[in-house]
Every structure is written in structure tokens, then in C-alpha cells.
Amino acid sequence: MANYFNTLNLRQQLAQLGKCRFMGRDEFADGASYLQGKKVVIVGCGAQGLNQGLNMRDSGLDISYALRKEAIAEKRASWRKATENGFKVGTYEELIPQADLVVNLTPDKQHSDVVRSVQPLMKDGAALGYSHGFNIVEVGEQIRKDITVVMVAPKCPGTEVREEYKRGFGVPTLIAVHPENDPKGEGMAIAKAWAAATGGHRAGVLESSFVAEVKSDLMGEQTILCGMLQAGSLLCFDKLVAEGTDPAYAEKLIQFGWENITEALKQGGITLMMDRLSNPAKLRAYALSEQLKEIMAPLFQKHMDDIISGEFSSGMMADWANDDKKLLTWREETGKTAFETAPQFEGKIGEQEYFDKGVLMIAMVKAGVELAFETMVDSGIIEESAYYESLHELPLIANTIARKRLYEMNVVISDTAEYGNYLFSYACVPLLKPFMAELQPGDLGSAIPEGAVDNAQLRDVNDAIRSHAIEQVGKKLRGYMTDMKRIAVAG
């Protein structure tokens, strides 16, 4: 099969990369009604599969789970999760033929096998749903022309999808209809109903395309969301220990530092994160971030180029065919790093201490977020999509590191994200070592002393931070989410 994106001409590629529209709340006035009374069969009961299914059932939809015969016979985790939550479970042959909508929520590497198994069983005119478009865009899966193909992609891990729904809200979501598979023109109605059933319409929905979702998602997870956090963790830990910091303290400062720093990012963007620093520290963090952007820009651009061309996907799929040899080797090597094996620190680190002693980490976050955003936008991806795939998801990934270091992050994210993370971090760590050798006292592990600052310089730095395009679009999108949350709570 041919990579779908590469079969398009340049005009079509640019049109699909640039498809992005923030949908009004009034467009979801009918909620999930378009799917009520219809049979929705979910294939896969992992984090997204289970939690989307729970939300959809609570929204009044008929949900069941189709699993492989072996998974049912051996009572595997997917079978246990579905049955323990009271769902009907059956084999593909038992459930797929009656389904009006089949939702494929298995891991990327299983998509081709799953689609080839379920497609012959699907009734004429049924719909096939995805929450990530890799199989369609990168693999180039060919779907029967009578089948409608849609996507609903929550911009959060599955557990968060459920928790926000239970709070009466939802998570920001991208929806799309595959232009090659919308025979009855009902794709958007199906996608909107599915998104509403998960609660996504309460947090904001972007009408996107399979292409824009895949290319931006891959770029975000490889660079700022996972790769930068992994490279930054390893580099910062080694630097602290080399300069005499207790390994246990160094580990805690980094493990929980990302989460504390990005919580400010979540609430008020890069502006608020930088405002948590003293004026001298802010000026230093800004200078460091500008140096980092200059050093890392070619690496970010290479990742984007390889994603656009399909080079990344072909390399990863070759590793799938080789029993994940590269992925498993990189995973094992990461587990043996000094950061992952360091002892735990039993003392307390105050919230402000993470900022005061983590100026370099803040600079890394700022540089990584801005570079990922800028590189995506330069490649034709609309700013709203680039924001969701860079700044918005970063606090969620940082939270996984706070739980069980890099191990937890790499367990929670998809194998696709993990593979891309290793590609980036293995290139980024040696790239930044000369930069790390030139750091000054106060950049990491100790606070920068208070002192006089140049007012004009501080003014210019503040203006540069606040006027960046990601701050402008971020303020708008965070405002939508806040407004919608108030409406949801009031309702």
C-alpha cells in the first residue's frame, strides 16, 4: 500500500494540512442523537477504548466490544476490563456484522490486521472510526467505498477523557472525515455525535483532516511532548550529579519539576511560566531558550521533514516487521540510565523551588514548545492544531514522568510516540552536550541571585514572550475552554 499523503498533489497536501476550524457549541445542539439507536462496536479495550466506551454508554449509546477469540478464551486484560464494566463482549464474527459504527481503538501497529479482519464482516453502508489516522495516512489502508471513515481524536490520554467527562466537562478533540470515504455525506454527523458522546464538545472541537491530525500529532509527540522531556531529563540529571548534587535530590528536582513548571504553562501559557521567575532569572531563561532554539532548530526541522515525507513512518514500520528490535533496545537502554535508577529523595521540595532552581528546564520547555509550534506552522499546519499538539498536551505528559519517571511516560504513550521519542532524544542529547558544558551557576540546581535589571531589556523580553503566535492562539483557545467549562458546570 502507498502512503496516502504521498499520493496527493501539492495543492491537496496543503489543503489537508491546513484544514482546521474551531467549531461552535451550537453545532453540537443535537448531542449524540445521530448515533442513538444504532449499534457501536469498539475494537480494543485499552485506555482509549475503555474510557471512550464508558463515556459513550453514559451518553445513551449502545456500546459493545469486539475482541479476538483468543482474548476472550484466555480472559485477557481487554476482556476483563470490558466485562467488569458491564459491557457486552463478543468475537468479531458475532458483533461486527450488526454494527452501524465500528471504532478501531487498537494500537497503531495492529490497525492493518484489525481492519483487514473486520472490513469483510462490516455491513454495507456502515462506518469505521479511528482516534488516530496513522493507518489511513501513513499506511495507506484502502477502505471499501461504501464505508464511511471518520476520526474523533481526544487530545488527552484515555483516563483523562473519562475523568473530565465525570466532572461534567470533556477534553479538546479533533474530528475529521476521510475525503475518500464519505459515500452518503454523513461522516461529519457521525463524527460530531461521537465527539459529543465522549464529552469533547464541552471543551472545544476542531474540525480537522486525517492528514493534519497525523502529521501534527507525530511532530508533537516526537519533539516537545516526549523527546524533549526525555532528553532534558537525562541531560539535566547528569549535569546536576556531575556538579556534586545529591543524585536523589537531582532526580526529584527533575522528575517533579516538569510537572510543576508545566502546570503554570497549562494555566497561562509561556507567559505565566516565565512570570514565576524573578526578573534576573527570567532574563537568563529567555537567553538560554534563544540559544537552545538556534541549536535545535535543524533537528526539529528534520523530524518534521521526515514526518511529511513518510520517511519516519517507513522506518518505524520496518522496525515493526523486525519484531520492534530498535524500539525494545532503546527502551531497555533508557531503563538503565542513571536518572531512571537513581534513589528516591525523601525530603520535600517546595513549589517555587522547582522554578528557582530549574531555570534551564524552563528554558527547555519554552524553546521546545515554540520550536515545535513554529516548525509545524511553517509546514502548513494551522496554528490551532499546532497549539494542541505542543503546549496543550505537555502538562499531561509531564504528569506521567511525575508518577514513575521516564518508564511511566513510555508505558502510557503509544508505541508510535515512544519510537519517535527515542529517535529525537538519541539525537538531541549529544547535540546539546556542548551547550550543557557552558552553563553558568544558577542555571540549574541553584537560584539566580536577585539583582538589578535593565528596564528596557526586561520590557523587550516580556514583549517578545507575550507576542509570540503560540501565546496569542493559546490565550484564545484556553479562553474557549474556560467559557465552555463555565457553561457545562452551570448546565
From Swiss-Prot:
EC identifiers of the protein: 1.1.1.86
Q: Which UniProt keywords apply?
A: Amino-acid biosynthesis, Branched-chain amino acid biosynthesis, Magnesium, Metal-binding, NADP, Oxidoreductase, Repeat
What top-level class of enzyme does the UniProt entry assign? oxidoreductase
Q: How does the cofactor bind to this protein, according to its record?
A: Binds 2 magnesium ions per subunit.
The active site annotation covers: 132
Q: Per UniProt, where does Mg(2+) 1 bind?
A: 217, 221
Instruction: Tell me the Gene Ontology biological-process terms attached to this UniProt entry.
Output: isoleucine biosynthetic process; L-valine biosynthetic process
Which residues belong to any copy of the KARI N-terminal Rossmann domain?
15-208
Entry's Gene Ontology molecular function annotations: ketol-acid reductoisomerase activity; magnesium ion binding
User: For binding substrate, which residues are annotated in this chain's numbering?
Assistant: 414
SUPFAM superfamilies given for it? 6-phosphogluconate dehydrogenase C-terminal domain-like, NAD(P)-binding Rossmann-fold domains
The function of this protein is: Involved in the biosynthesis of branched-chain amino acids (BCAA). Catalyzes an alkyl-migration followed by a ketol-acid reduction of (S)-2-acetolactate (S2AL) to yield (R)-2,3-dihydroxy-isovalerate. In the isomerase reaction, S2AL is rearranged via a Mg-dependent methyl migration to produce 3-hydroxy-3-methyl-2-ketobutyrate (HMKB). In the reductase reaction, this 2-ketoacid undergoes a metal-dependent reduction by NADPH to yield (R)-2,3-dihydroxy-isovalerate.
Q: Which family does it belong to?
A: Belongs to the ketol-acid reductoisomerase family.
Instruction: Report what the protein is called.
Output: Ketol-acid reductoisomerase (NADP(+))
